[in-house]
Amino acid sequence: MRFSTASRHAVAAAYLIRLLSITFGQNVIVVDASVLAVALGDYGTDGQHARERLAGETLVAPELVDLEVVSVWRRHVAAKLMSARRAASAVADLADLPLRRSSHQSFLHRIWELRHVVTPYDAAYIALAEALDVVLVTADARLSRASGVHCEIEAIDGASGG
C-alpha cells in the first residue's frame, strides 16, 4: 500500500508531536518561525531534516511565533506553493506542538538594541535564546550570520523557511 505525500507528512508531524511530548524537558532550544514553518509545512527533504533536528528537544519561542508561522503558510498558499488543505493541517499541527511560548515583553530593551542588525521579530528570538543561554535554531541562513548577538545561532542546512 502506498501512502500519499500528505499522509506521510501527517504521520511525520504526529510522530514529531508525540516524540516532543515524551521528551519534553530534555535539551532546550529556541526555534524561530522559519524552522517551524519548514518542519510542519514541508513534506520534502527540507521538512524531514528540520523535523529530525527538532526531535527530542524542548522547544521554546516568543509567543509571536504562531503568527509568523501562519503568515509564512498564508504567503505560500497565495503563491500556490502550498495547498490550503495542507496549510490547515499544518496549522493544526502547530496548535498541537508542545512548544513553550514566552512573552517578548521583558526583552523589549534587548530587541531595541538589536534594531540595526535584525528585525524586531528576529530580535525577539535572539533575545530569548540569549536569556536562556541556549541555541537558536533557524532555517534562515542570513539570521545565523547576524553580528552582535550573544547566543549560538544554528541554521539548518538545506531548509528554506520564510
Give a label for each model feature.
Residues V70-P98, S102, R110-I111:
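Active-site-proximal, substrate-binding regions of enzyme catalytic domains
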Residues R2-L64, H76-R85, A159-G162:
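Short, well-structured N-terminal submotif of metal-dependent ribonuclease cores
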Residues R101-H104, I153-G158:
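Short acidic-hydrophobic, aromatic-tinged amphipathic segments that line or gate anion-handling sites
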Residues F3-R8, A12-L19, L97-R142:
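Active-site neighborhoods of divalent-metal-dependent phosphate/nucleic-acid chemistry enzymes
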